[in-house]
Amino acid sequence: MSFSDYISRIKDNIRNSIKGKAIIAVSGGQDSSLLSLLASEVLGNNLLCVFIDTGLLRKNETGRVKDFFEKHSMNYVIVDAADTFINNLKGVTDPEEKRKIIGKTFIDVLSEQAQNFGAEYLLQGTIAPDWIESGGQKRDTIKSHHNVGGLPKDMKLKLVEPLRDYYKDEIRGMSKELGLPTDIQPFPGPGLAVRIIGEVTKEKLDLLRAVTDIVERKISEAMPSESRPWQYFAVLLPVRTTGVHGDRRAYGLTVGIRMIETTDAMTGTFSKPSWDLLEDISNTITDEIPEINRVVYDITNKPPATIEWE
């Protein structure tokens, strides 16, 4: 079956499943971007695309998603809920607890938008690895996914998941077929919160946002899109180490760099970039962000590790 056939099947699924107004949360990642575009083509103004600025996003994420909505003439709203999310995460260090708090807060904000719009259906970009890792079909739960299991039992919206049988390579193939960018970096629903080990604060988010921008920029500059790792990102660690800034001792923060090669996100191997690229990334981070004085590289495959650290 071709990617064009997959697209037709998904649109038929949406057409047959939704008989009224629907809402979809768009993160800017590949899954929700693809689904929102296909659903918009089927439902028109009966679909409301909602982008929630959680304060846990990468640099320029809001502007990029707004441009996507405008380019495709989609019906959308952008909600700034950053303060709510960050306040709800105060004092929380457990990764599962973080995910659940973010999921509940997200649904609360989304439900308000759904009520205002009069939506009866919730479209969600859940794909196969999401529900498999979340304990679907009698598997043990590896970790809760933002798209899976976070919906309240008394939710009045009917859930529709047209992508749940598809894998990442198929999502990318369909995106390419539609002319969507295929080099969009996968980004977890809970955002940078699960790339900060320990408590999430605005200061840590600002640091990690700057580091993430450097990592993505340096890899984009060094490698053509077809040669880049499948996913690459930074993690802020709760580890301070001794270093030197100028002629003074410094006790700075540590970041980990993760680059992974995979086709379906179910298994993967760590990427083996050039030493020159790793050195350039490390030097740029420590030069531009004085709070950080150590950069480490993650050489763990999946399994035993998951792609994200939390």
Curated annotation (Swiss-Prot):
The entry's keywords: ATP-binding, GMP biosynthesis, Ligase, Nucleotide-binding, Purine biosynthesis
Binding site residues for ATP: S27, G28, G29, Q30, D31, S32, S33
Domain GMPS ATP-PPase residues, every copy: 1-187
Recorded superkingdom: Archaea
GO MF annotation list: ATP binding; GMP synthase activity
E.C. number: 6.3.5.2
InterPro entries: GMP_synth_C, GMP_synthase_B, GMPS_ATP_PPase_dom, NAD/GMP_synthase, Rossmann-like_a/b/a_fold
GO annotation, cellular component aspect: cytosol
Pathway(s) this gene product operates in, as recorded in its UniProt entry: Purine metabolism; GMP biosynthesis; GMP from XMP (L-Gln route): step 1/1
Reaction(s) this enzyme catalyzes, per UniProt: XMP + L-glutamine + ATP + H2O = GMP + L-glutamate + AMP + diphosphate + 2 H(+)
Subunit structure: Heterodimer composed of a glutamine amidotransferase subunit (A) and a GMP-binding subunit (B).
Name listed for the protein in its UniProt record: GMP synthase [glutamine-hydrolyzing] subunit B
